[in-house]
């Protein structure tokens, strides 16, 4: 199945249990083979293609919570040192996805972390072990240290997610953050973003999650993410992801279930 415009707002860890994945961004492509764990940096977007390679669930994943990342940074920090320019050098898209040298221990740790099977203190060190098995642990450390802070756009995303049924305007964001509209616009421009695209990304991200994780009808989902017209929601969804909500639902839910 192929999907466009996948946006990640958190670090995501994925295990390609019964599939291979092709990630595309511009002219760059990342291939993740079957039965591999990989870590995706937050605030990236890409197109994705999944190809089944066995029976059962295609892949499993979980988001890394901000608190866990902050603790992970404290654990890693004493053991790594980088020149100042390491944090300012532009990294390619490929350098924002970290493949983990997978073995039975790594896969077991992935499952424990996904299922919250360990106390928080233990989970931090389990995650640190997982990271140490990355193909390029130093590059992951640079990623972590560079992005652990909450950006301005992330603060807006959190605000938008708090009530997607609201008809958000730039003036609403300015009022909530106690700054001017011009300041909001300029600070988003510094991150190469604009408000209209950001709110579209957030609405479509949440719509996809509702389709995957709930039994809501398309009309209900449209309303929950701020659309009064179901037909306009369907049109927007198709333009954004490259498939209609119904085809997305059929494809995703069939692929996530056991292949019969």
Curated annotation (Swiss-Prot):
Pfam families associated with the record: HTH_18
UniProt KW Transcription keyword: yes
Matches recorded under SUPFAM superfamilies: Homeodomain-like
A GO term for molecular function: DNA-binding transcription factor activity
DNA-binding residues (ranges): 171-192, 218-241
SMART domains per UniProt: HTH_ARAC
Record organism: Escherichia coli
Domain of life: Bacteria
Keywords: Activator, DNA-binding, Transcription, Transcription regulation
InterPro entries linked: Homeodomain-like_sf, HTH_AraC, HTH_AraC-typ_CS, Tscrpt_reg_AraC-type_HTH
Record field: transmembrane: none
Record flagged with keyword Transcription: yes
Functional description taken from the UniProt entry: Positive regulator of the expression of the 987P operon for the fimbrial protein in enterotoxigenic E.coli.
UniProt name for this protein: HTH-type transcriptional activator FapR
Assembly description: Homodimer.
Domain HTH araC/xylS-type: 154-251
GO annotations of cellular component type: cytosol
């Amino acid at each position: 199945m192929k999907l466009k415009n996948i946006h990640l707002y958190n670090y995501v860890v994925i295990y390609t249990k019964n599939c291979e994945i092709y990630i595309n961004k511009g002219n760059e492509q990342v291939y993740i083979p079957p039965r591999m764990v990989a870590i995706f940096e937050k605030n990236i977007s890409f197109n994705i293609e999944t190809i089944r390679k066995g029976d059962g669930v295609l892949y499993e994943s979980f988001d890394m919570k901000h608190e866990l990342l902050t603790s992970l940074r404290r654990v890693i920090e004493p053991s790594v040192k980088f020149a100042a320019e390491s944090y300012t050098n532009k990294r390619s898209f490929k350098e924002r996805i970290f493949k983990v040298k997978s073995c039975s221990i790594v896969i077991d740790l992935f499952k424990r972390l996904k299922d919250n099977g360990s106390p928080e203190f233990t989970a931090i060190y389990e995650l640190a072990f997982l990271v140490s098995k990355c193909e390029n642990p130093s590059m992951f450390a640079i990623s972590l240290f560079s992005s652990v802070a909450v950006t301005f756009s992330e603060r807006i995303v959190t605000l938008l997610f708090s009530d997607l049924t609201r008809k958000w305007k730039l003036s609403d964001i300015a009022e909530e953050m106690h700054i001017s509209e011009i300041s909001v616009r300029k600070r988003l421009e510094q991150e190469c973003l604009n408000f209209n695209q950001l709110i579209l990304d957030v609405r479509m991200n949440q719509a996809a999650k509702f389709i995957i994780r709930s039994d809501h009808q398309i009309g209900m989902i449209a309303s929950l993410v701020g659309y009064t017209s179901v037909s306009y929601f369907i049109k927007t969804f198709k333009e954004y992801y490259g498939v209609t909500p119904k085809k997305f639902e059929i494809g995703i839910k069939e692929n996530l279930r056991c292949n019969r």
